[in-house]
Amino acid sequence: MVPMHLLGRLEKPLLLLCCASFLLGLALLGIKTDITPVAYFFLTLGGFFLFAYLLVRFLEWGLRSQLQSMQTESPGPSGNARDNEAFEVPVYEEAVVGLESQCRPQELDQPPPYSTVVIPPAPEEEQPSHPEGSRRAKLEQRRMASEGSMAQEGSPGRAPINLRLRGPRAVSTAPDLQSLAAVPTLEPLTPPPAYDVCFGHPDDDSVFYEDNWAPP
């Protein structure tokens, strides 16, 4: 089969030869009557070129329609690959890993949230002998129990993380800081001092007024 680019190159030469043959035949018919066979020959040759031109045009139109139909029926491997990627369903493991990464966006270097931290109560090695120590221990146990319940309510599906500090606890030597639970003692209120106010001479504005003072 003749390729399409070759058919496109044959169109213009065939059309040019057809027009030239028709013009030459008509010119010979008008000039002299004794050369009529030659004029008919050029007219016939122009008709042949015209037929060849129309045949080339028809073949070109047929090839274009055939290529368009082939492209519509089979878009090609690239189009099929794009369609497969668009309608591809991920594997169950990939979907689960993606959901877990979306639910936990924090990095590994960052500490866990406060709701997942549970501080266990300290082991009871020895019972305090004085009432202030027992009261402080009860307050600490109550605070740790409330924090543990808040952590369990905030994240039921996550395992608790123990972030208890290791090592001995630092105890303050100041007496005010040792007994935090004790009620502070209040200082007695001192009454204001008494002032002697004299209303004997209300119209006198002198600040040097005295009872035994006499004008000179």
From Swiss-Prot:
Disulfide bonds: none annotated. Interacts with isoform 2 of SLC4A1. Keywords: Membrane, Phosphoprotein, Signal, Transmembrane, Transmembrane helix. Residues 1-25 form the signal peptide. Residues 56-216 are cytoplasmic. This is Transmembrane protein 139. Residues 104-163 are annotated as: Disordered. The chain crosses the membrane at residues 35-55. Residues 127-145 have a biased composition (Basic and acidic residues). GO terms for cellular component: membrane. Its main location: membrane. May be involved in cellular trafficking of proteins such as SLC4A1. Residues 26-34 are extracellular. It is a single-pass type I membrane protein. It comes from the Eukaryota. The modification Phosphoserine is found at residues 146, 155. It is found in: Membrane.
